């Protein structure tokens, strides 16, 4: 019987909390000054690598998002050193930051579904008169 949550998932969950605190309190880079949320962390099985997925409050501006990700990549060594102090791990994983567009895509899909439902309701209330010809 497989474990429901293995060690990589537990470490990723704790790391997500710690990175969020570090970004909130320690990172002073103005490129990351916009509200940054850590939406997820994926760990490799050997806990040596971590993919950190982030979203930004001001994510409509693509240039700002790219600059934010670049700033996080440049600060990854500093973030990694703070993680080493906050968490007791034999190997502090190498961090790679990615922009998580799943929230934006989810909102877009939700809007599409809402529009289709609204259009369908309008068709039911006002059937086309052209069918009587």
Swiss-Prot record:
InterPro entries: KH_dom-like_a/b, RbfA, RbfA_dom_sf, Ribosome-bd_factorA_CS. GO terms for cellular component: cytosol. Its main location: cytoplasm. Keywords: Cytoplasm, Ribosome biogenesis. Disulfide bonds: none annotated. One of its GO terms (biological process) is maturation of SSU-rRNA. The keyword Cytoplasm applies. Belongs to the RbfA family. One of several proteins that assist in the late maturation steps of the functional core of the 30S ribosomal subunit. Associates with free 30S ribosomal subunits (but not with 30S subunits that are part of 70S ribosomes or polysomes). Required for efficient processing of 16S rRNA. May interact with the 5'-terminal helix region of 16S rRNA. Monomer. Binds 30S ribosomal subunits, but not 50S ribosomal subunits or 70S ribosomes. This is Ribosome-binding factor A.
């Amino acid at each position: 019987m497989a474990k429901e949550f293995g060690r990589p998932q537990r470490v990723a969950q704790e790391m997500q909390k710690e990175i969020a605190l570090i970004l909130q309190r320690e990172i002073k880079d103005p490129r990351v000054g916009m509200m940054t949320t850590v939406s997820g962390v994926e760990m490799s099985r050997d806990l040596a690598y971590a993919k950190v997925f982030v979203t930004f409050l001001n994510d409509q501006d693509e240039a700002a998002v790219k600059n934010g990700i670049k700033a996080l990549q440049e600060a990854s060594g500093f973030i990694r050193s703070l993680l080493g102090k906050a968490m007791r791990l034999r190997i502090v994983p190498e961090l790679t930051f990615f922009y998580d567009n799943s929230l934006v895509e989810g909102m877009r899909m939700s809007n599409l579904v809402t529009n289709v439902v609204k259009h369908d309701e309008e068709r039911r209330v006002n059937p086309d008169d052209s069918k009587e010809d």
